[in-house]
């Protein structure tokens, strides 16, 4: 695991997240009353009106967790894995893709779950629940998205040998493309598309990382395509002839 950073770096990460957790526990509190709900931050009230405190908190924290977990997994593993898959020997590239992605995901899993400690503490202080089911699902979906984005980023890094930054950029752009194409899944037939065309588009969309929380990430079509699709494409990319980075 030293390939993904020193133990000192992980210790600093843990201490930073624990410090933020302490701030959250001391400074933030939620209140729900007959007149509405409010959040107290260092004793200063932030009124939320008549909104349910629980629905307000969970609605916002789900999106935060989905983004934070996926980005931490991606950024925590991409650099070392992309360097491993840039090896001159084909066997080493394939090993780097499969073994490196697995180790990178494990490293990102550790970093992301440590990063969520302040979020769990915030949920507990605001609504009295540390691990509500809605946030647990958002955490799991974020891990799946992070793995999917990591696979796509490594694939792009292999194809775009000149720039790892471009590989990350294309991965993030690809994540934003999926929700836009989902419009045609809902209204494609109303626009004159045939059922087969909509089905082909659905398969393509399933391959892409999604910038919004999915409703059925474990369906028989979704999971094999979202993870297996970029994994197969990445493995094929590792078979391409080696080329030096510019």
Predicted regions and their residues:
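Terminal transmembrane helical anchor/hairpin motif
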Residues: 27-59, 168-246
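Transmembrane alpha-helical segments in integral membrane proteins
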Residues: 66-85, 154-166, 227-246
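Secretory targeting signals
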Residues: 22-33, 38-73, 100-169
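Aromatic- and glycine-rich beta-strand/loop motifs that create alpha-glucan
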Residues: 1-19
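Membrane-interacting alpha-helical segments
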Residues: 1, 5, 133, 137, ...
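Helix-loop-helix units of permease transmembrane domains in multi-pass membrane transporters
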Residues: 75-108
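Central hydrophobic cores of alpha-helical transmembrane segments
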Residues: 13-21, 163-177
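Membrane-interface helix-boundary signature
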Residues: 6-9, 58, 62, 134, ...
